């Protein structure tokens, strides 16, 4: 008798399991082996539940990008609803949607549960119902025959190694001068004015002597004029 009861309970548990089929669409690109390794997919149970919550990870099964989450613990009782959160991420692409609320609703014994999907938003991962309107209503997605996840664009390059000490040309006053074309022009002008007399003296000493003589004569004339006015 106990064996029959145990077998009946086991069949009830098996009957209360379902599968969610999904697909990653990177068209027009083909999914490569690198995409298989650098794409992460996770599904976990949210909302009211008893016992251990469901949590599973999936990998891409084929070059078409198909993946699935199997043995989801759901109830076949009519009007019973179980919620799961699907999180998709990639090291190379920004995926859309990257958060999906999965709703599995029982339809009674002998009938497959109804699977619905809603595009979730950041900060609402643990809200167990799409009917919560704050801050916005969730957009329903096509879940049959499979939920499709695509990509927006390539993700920005990530700096896995960041130098703690940057050089003087990367930060500080000198970096500010090199980044601004106006400051750079002012510095070049000042340096040119400082170097001009030395360059002229080196390449044209006769002109330099003439300039010095002219300055000396102007100084003598100035002092001579001052002496005559005092006398």
Curated annotation (Swiss-Prot):
It is a single-pass type I membrane protein. Residues 17-183 are lumenal. InterPro entries: Sop4. Its main location: endoplasmic reticulum. Glycans are attached at residues 48, 79. Keywords: Endoplasmic reticulum, Glycoprotein, Membrane, Protein transport, Signal, Transmembrane, Transmembrane helix, Transport. One of its GO terms (biological process) is protein transport. The chain crosses the membrane at residues 184-200. It is found in: Endoplasmic reticulum membrane. The keyword Amino-acid biosynthesis does not apply. Residues 201-231 are cytoplasmic. GO terms for cellular component: endoplasmic reticulum membrane. Residues 1-16 form the signal peptide. The keyword Transmembrane helix applies. It comes from the Eukaryota. Involved in the export of PMA1, possibly through the monitoring or assisting of PMA1 folding and acquisition of competence to enter vesicles. Belongs to the SOP4 family. This is Protein SOP4. It comes from Eremothecium gossypii (strain ATCC 10895 / CBS 109.51 / FGSC 9923 / NRRL Y-1056) (Yeast).
């Amino acid at each position: 008798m106990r064996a029959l009861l145990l077998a009946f309970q086991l069949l009830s548990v098996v009957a209360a399991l379902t599968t969610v089929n999904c697909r990653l669409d990177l068209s027009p690109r083909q999914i490569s082996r690198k995409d298989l390794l650098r794409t992460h997919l996770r599904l976990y149970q949210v909302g009211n539940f008893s016992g251990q919550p469901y949590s599973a990870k999936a990998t891409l099964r084929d070059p078409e990008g198909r993946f699935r989450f199997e043995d989801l613990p759901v109830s076949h009782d009519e009007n019973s609803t179980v919620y799961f959160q699907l999180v998709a991420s990639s090291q190379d692409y920004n995926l859309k949607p990257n958060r999906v609320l999965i709703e599995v609703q029982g339809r009674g014994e002998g009938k497959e549960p109804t699977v619905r999907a809603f595009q979730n938003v950041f900060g609402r991962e643990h809200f167990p119902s799409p009917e919560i309107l704050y801050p916005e209503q969730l957009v329903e997605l096509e879940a049959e025959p499979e939920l499709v996840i695509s990509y927006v664009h390539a993700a920005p390059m990530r700096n896995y190694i960041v130098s703690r000490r940057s050089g003087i040309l990367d930060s500080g006053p000198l970096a500010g001068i090199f980044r601004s074309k106006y400051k750079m022009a002012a510095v070049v002008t000042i340096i040119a004015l400082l170097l001009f007399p030395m360059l002229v003296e080196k390449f044209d000493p006769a002109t330099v002597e003439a300039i010095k003589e002219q300055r000396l004569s102007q100084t003598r004339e100035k002092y001579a004029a001052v002496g005559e006015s005092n006398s």
